[in-house]
């Protein structure tokens, strides 16, 4: 048996939300595995820092500071690329509110960012992938960043749960439509990860204690845990995996 090694040389990966946290870790991990990167975030200063790290691995890196909910801007960026082999659809947010107190503008913004822009990015990147004549031979990978909250309920997260559950349905539908082109589509579903986005929540000692008690492995995920799963799904090591989810949740959803 020949064990497939993770080697992403001659592959180009686009990562959104790449300026910080999970997206940053994923971009760096993909570069370490040999991929060239296209990184997108809202803040150029953050992108410059990530780009500098990526180039240490001798990978090419192009960065774009933009809002992924701006369809015209995203379309122009993707259409101007020579090729895309891997998409890490990572940009997203959470605005915790009790269901009865969810503000209309917050709900609409989360749906726009977490679900609609994810759909547009996936569609645009897939069309770019299909421009490569030997796509069926070399394959492609779309990784939608979901959440364990797409699989379980949680307080003050009804809108977040809804948007991430939508990604699970999108992923399965895409996987079926794109299988004939050897483009695989999966989600990665992390538990609470220590990132700038979750840092404020974890300052609450009661919340931190109660959350840890729900994770059988007894710790929060690190961004490297998520990046490892993403790199695996981006590579030929996962060539028979599509239309499913990798739960990086420390056992939370098994309880």
Kindly give the residue locations of the regions a language model identified.
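C-terminal substrate-recognition "lid" of short-chain dehydrogenase/reductases
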Residues: 2, 183, 219-248, 253-254
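Conserved glycine-rich cofactor-binding loop
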Residues: 12, 19-21
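The beta1-alpha1 cofactor-binding region of Rossmann-like NAD(H)/NADP(H)-dependent oxidoreductases
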Residues: 45, 64-76, 104, 225
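Substrate-binding pocket helix/loop in short-chain dehydrogenase/reductase
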Residues: 98-99, 103-111, 211
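Active-site helix of classical SDR
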Residues: 122, 163, 171
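Alpha-helical segment proximal to the catalytic Tyr-Lys
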Residues: 127, 176-180, 239
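Residue(s) in the substrate-gating loop at a strand-loop-helix junction
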Residues: 147
